[in-house]
Structures are given as structure tokens and as C-alpha cells.
């Protein structure tokens, strides 16, 4: 983790430069992220399903100076005037690997001045029309979001404990999350990755989703948390090999990106030792919005959850909305 900031800084003309990452989930994605934001530069995780034209648009739009990617994502970008670093998992002699990029640099964290309101990330999110929109987030915005998640998670756990229910503590050496969604999305990067850094939770990373492989990883790695779209936990429940594995380590079956059918909530709670949860957020809010879990979610399976501080719920009946297009 300490070498990427040094090597990234040495390749930069300014600490505020923009660096882009596009690869499937792998540990070097995380190393690159920490190296970029650790020097006060802007990290731009791009959709790994994009094709060359879409990648080129985003790179030119955000004026990226350096690109970390795997072989498949770097393909077709030969004419793009940008420094390209390839993941060590997909070596190619045409590019410098991440291992080579960091080898000659110190393990000491560089001394750089970073303001709380300096930009840290740009996540591209599709709009209703036109090209994807780049969403800027600051160092303060991301850190405050992670602490807000920690706060509400602690409150929910304490409530379950008072009610005599089994609960998932925020910290502990036994905690492990199955990172089963893309790191280029705020659910993967914030809820799974960055929260794990804060609380010291083990990350069990999947390159891509496969319900059968997920069951095996939960069994082998004693996974306690899983957060993804509701379909993923539903696939675990209905997989033909489910009963071949010990899934009793699971404590949280998190979901987001869409509602769960009420009947699914009930069946998940009845068939897993872990309890289902749900959340709602936006790229623009670093995934922060609402959360629900435990008995409250079981009793109100159609809910999107309670508003998480510092998010404020606003009633549209008290708003005067514009009547003309701006």
C-alpha cells in the first residue's frame, strides 16, 4: 500500500493530476486507488465493461494523465497519449506492469499537503440521455460517508443486541466480507472496500460473480458479510449446491441497487443464519442514503430503510418545484 503513492507521485507533474483505473476486481485495483488518493490526486475508476470508444471518451473528458488497466481494457488504446500501466495479473511486454512501476520506490508514505475539500474521485454514472456523467467527490465527502456508515451500523447492531438477537459487530478479527460487486461502483469501493479499511475487515474478492463460487468462498473463508444486488443473495438461496456448504458464518446479507421482493426477505431470513439488510444511495452521495436491517426490515420488507445521518429526508409536499425547463 505504501509504494504506490511514491511511484504515482514520481510520475506526476502535479499532485492534483487525474489517474484512471479500469480492470476487473483484483488487489492491484485497491493498491492503485490508495496510491492515487494518498497523494491528493483524483482517482477515476471506469466501468470494466466499456469498449475502447467509451474508455477514450472518459479519459479525454477527465483529462487523465496515467491509466492502470488489465490487458483486455488496454486493448485498442495504442494511439491514446497517456501513460499506461498494466496489472501484473495480465502481463504484456508492451506495457509496464504495476509491480515494475512500484519496485524502485520507498515504503515510506510521501509527505504531501491534502485539504479536506480536495477532489479525490470521479465516478462515471449513466444519465437518462447522452454520455455518462462524471461525479466528483472530495476527500471529506468520502471519509464522512464511511464514518456515517460506521455510525449507523453500530446503532443497528446495538439495537439488535438489546432485543436479544444475534448481531454483527462493527469490528473483530473474525469479520470478512465477500466483495462480489465491481470496484468501479460505489457499492464495491465504498461499502465493501473502504469500510473494510476502516474497521479492519478481511476482504474476500471475487473477479466476477458466480453463485457457486461464492458459496465455496463463504464456506472456506468464513465470510460474515455479503453486500450486492438483491438477486445475488437470492441466487445463493436457490443454488442447487447450497446445502453442501457451511454458511453459518454469514451474519449480514446486504442488498442495494434495487428493492427485494417482500417474500424474498422472509425466505432469506428463514433459510440463513445471517439476516437480510437493504440500503439505498447514489453515486453522487458516495452510496450514502438509507439503511435497514434486523427485525425492522423483516417487519417492513418493502422499506428502503431509515435515512442515515447526515442525509435529510425531504417531503415533496413542502417543495416548490420549477415549472419551466432550465
Regions flagged by a language model, labelled:
Residues 106-124, 131, 168-176:
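Conserved pre-ATP/AMP-binding loop-to-beta segment of ANL
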Residues 1, 5-15, 19, 318-326:
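Single conserved hydrophobic/aromatic residue that forms the stacking wall/gate
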Residues 120-151, 156-158, 324:
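Conserved AMP-binding A3 loop
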Residues 143-179, 184-224, 239:
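Conserved AMP-binding/adenylation subdomain of ANL enzymes
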Residues 127, 198-199, 220-228, 237-299, ...:
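Gly/Ser/Thr-rich phosphate-binding loop
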Residues 72-116, 143:
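ANL superfamily adenylate-forming
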Residues 34-39, 57, 61, 185, ...:
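Short hydrophobic alpha-helices that are characteristic scaffold elements of the AMP-binding
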Residues 13-50:
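Conserved AMP-binding/adenylate-forming
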Amino acid at each position: 500500500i505504501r509504494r504506490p503513492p511514491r511511484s504515482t507521485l514520481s510520475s506526476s507533474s502535479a499532485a492534483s493530476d487525474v489517474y484512471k483505473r479500469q480492470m476487473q476486481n483484483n488487489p492491484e485495483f485497491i493498491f492503485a486507488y490508495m496510491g492515487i488518493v494518498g497523494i491528493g490526486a483524483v482517482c477515476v475508476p471506469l466501468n470494466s465493461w466499456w469498449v475502447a470508444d467509451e474508455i477514450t471518451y472518459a479519459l479525454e473528458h477527465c483529462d487523465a494523465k496515467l491509466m492502470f488497466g488489465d490487458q483486455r481494457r488496454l486493448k485498442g488504446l495504442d494511439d491514446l497519449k497517456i501513460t499506461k500501466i498494466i496489472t501484473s495479473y495480465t502481463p504484456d511486454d508492451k506495457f509496464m506492469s504495476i509491480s515494475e512501476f512500484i519496485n524502485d520506490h520507498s515504503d515510506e508514505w510521501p509527505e504531501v499537503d491534502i485539504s479536506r475539500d480536495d477532489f479525490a474521485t470521479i465516478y462515471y454514472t449513466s444519465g437518462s440521455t447522452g454520455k455518462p456523467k462524471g461525479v466528483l467527490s472530495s476527500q471529506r465527502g468520502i471519509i464522512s460517508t464511511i464514518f456515517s456508515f460506521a455510525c449507523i451500523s453500530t446503532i443497528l447492531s446495538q439495537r439488535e443486541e438489546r432485543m436479544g438477537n444475534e448481531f454483527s459487530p462493527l469490528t473483530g478479527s473474525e469479520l470478512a466480507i465477500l466483495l462480489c460487486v465491481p470496484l468501479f461502483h460505489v457499492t464495491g469501493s465504498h461499502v465493501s472496500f473502504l469500510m473494510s479499511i476502516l474497521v479492519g475487515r478481511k476482504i474476500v474478492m471475487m473477479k466476477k460473480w458466480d453463485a457457486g463460487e461464492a458459496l465455496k468462498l463463504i464456506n472456506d473463508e468464513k465470510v460474515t458479510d455479503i453486500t450486492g444486488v438483491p438477486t445475488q443473495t437470492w441466487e445463493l438461496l436457490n443454488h442447487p449446491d447450497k446445502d453442501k456448504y457451511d454458511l453459518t458464518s454469514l451474519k449480514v446479507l446486504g442488498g442495494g441497487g434495487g428493492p427485494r421482493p417482500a417474500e424474498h426477505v422472509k425466505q432469506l431470513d428463514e433459510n440463513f443464519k445471517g439476516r437480510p439488510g437493504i440500503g439505498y444511495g447514489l453515486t453522487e452521495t458516495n452510496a450514502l442514503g438509507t439503511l435497514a436491517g434486523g427485525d425492522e426490515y423483516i417487519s417492513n420488507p418493502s422499506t428502503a430503510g431509515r435515512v442515515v445521518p447526515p442525509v435529510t429526508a425531504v417531503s415533496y409536499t413542502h417543495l416548490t418545484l420549477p415549472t419551466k425547463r432550465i
